[in-house]
Amino acid sequence: MKIGITCYPTYGGSGVVATELGKALAERGHQVHFISYALPSRLDGFLGNIIYHEVEMSTYPLFEFPLYTPALASKMVEVAKFEKLDILHVHYAVPHAISAYLAKQIIGNKLKIITTLHGTDITLVGLEPSFLHMMKFIIEKSDGVTAVSRFLRDKTITNFQIEKEIEVIYNFINPEKYQRRENLELRKSIAPDNEKIVIHTSNFRTVKRVPDVIRIFNEIRKKIKAKLILIGDGPERSACEMLCRELGICADVKFLGKQSDIVPLLSVSDLFLIPSQSESFGLSALEAMACEIPVISSSVGGLPELQVHGETGYIAEIGDIDRMAKYSIELLTNLTKHTIFSEAARN
């Protein structure tokens, strides 16, 4: 098949899943065309049947805001016509599904549109009053719709009164890539005195509650020797660095920024924290679990569908720093329980 894929090309979960899906389809012999404003971050290496098409943006001074939606639709038309695409698979309804629908109307052929809902396009952006009618229309007009969790499917149906069937297809990872590979040298460089290593990865947006991660770690640190690794970057990083200085824990916290390969860092870590305000699935938690790391998470969105409280980690209410810290200390000080949870997380 000839498949077009549009996603946000960033380090977020939706872009990662879309890119890994495209690579896997290409390995199975399909021709895959990525259509976006930048090269997806995970699209590394060369595959002969993967082609990237960059969306060209107009800089005409009359327009106060970039016209990405029509520019994307125009590029979709171009690629679909000349590459004879069978399917356009768009990740995020806003604005990608809108552009795909416009492209299909322009082409007027049997091009199929599959829309995958990932979260904030439904739970935040889509609930803006000015978007409500458009969101319902574009979901109903897609030839197929998937959501990354039951939580997101149900919320979409309720919020927009959707009658169309939405299939739940959970996010995924390659278990052969995401598996624990012990690296004593790397671990010693991070924790020279054999401290426990706590890790968090995110885009440092408000919804991820990274300051909670730091406060939980501060409580852990009062009881046991530990180090915190923070992977990623975003608007709250500076505030988080300031919080570390205020708490006097900078020596034990490492801000590593964006990393192209996080498996080595996951492989030396003992605990993963994800205290998010909202999380439609939680791909970063799945990556950690595949590397045999117990997870401490908030009880939001799709996270309770991903991990089992008391088996693969623990779940607490949003903002309950004391309870998350208590659970963390329990796992980090009980080797037998930690081993059982680690094995369950992988399996």
Regions found by a protein language model. Name each.
Residues R323, E330, K337-N347:
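A short, well-ordered alpha-helix in the C-terminal region of glycosyltransferases
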